[in-house]
Regions:
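Small beta-barrel nucleic-acid-binding modules, primarily SNase/OB-fold domains
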Residues: 2-6, 11-150
Length: 150
């Protein structure tokens, strides 16, 4: 069983997950939709290589964020509202599945953070996850921007 879970983790960590010809899930806050790289605006999810500590064990929290997004999207194609481009020329957007914000879902689930440097929109959702020790808030972690060094 542990071997199968390890294989699944490696699969999710190393491949862009594609459910349709026009959707690939890159990580917890980035998708490619119709060939366009979209970074979810206002949030920051852990990097794929990022780990957290829970009960003295390393947890692949970056992979967990991606898996959570994969499960949430399911076989749906997100609808995204563009907010412009970032310095890396990615489209910044808020994306929805069944009229639910994927950004809000990830932050309330504790696997993304309100990216206060750029937006205040998801602060209450982050406070909800933090106060209820949901997701990464139940672990010891580094914020993604600290992990990346920026």
């Amino acid at each position: 069983m542990k071997k199968n879970l390890w294989i699944l983790f490696i699969f999710f960590a190393t491949y862009n997950i594609s459910f349709a010809d026009n959707l690939k899930i890159v990580d917890g806050d980035t998708i490619i939709l119709n060939g366009e790289k979209i970074r979810f605006s206002g949030i920051d999810a852990p990097e794929l290589k990022q780990t957290c500590i829970q009960n003295d064990k390393k947890v692949k929290c970056g992979v967990s964020a991606k898996i959570l997004l994969v499960k949430k999207i399911g076989n749906n194609i997100p609808k995204c509202i563009s907010e412009g481009k970032d310095v890396y020329k990615r489209t910044l957007a808020e994306c929805f599945v069944n009229e639910e914000s994927l950004s809000k879902f990830l932050v309330r689930s504790g696997y993304a953070f309100a990216y206060r440097k750029y937006s205040k929109k998801f602060i209450k959702d982050e406070e909800f996850a933090k106060n209820n020790k949901i997701g990464m808030w139940s672990m010891t972690f580094e914020y993604p921007w600290t992990f990346r060094g920026n």
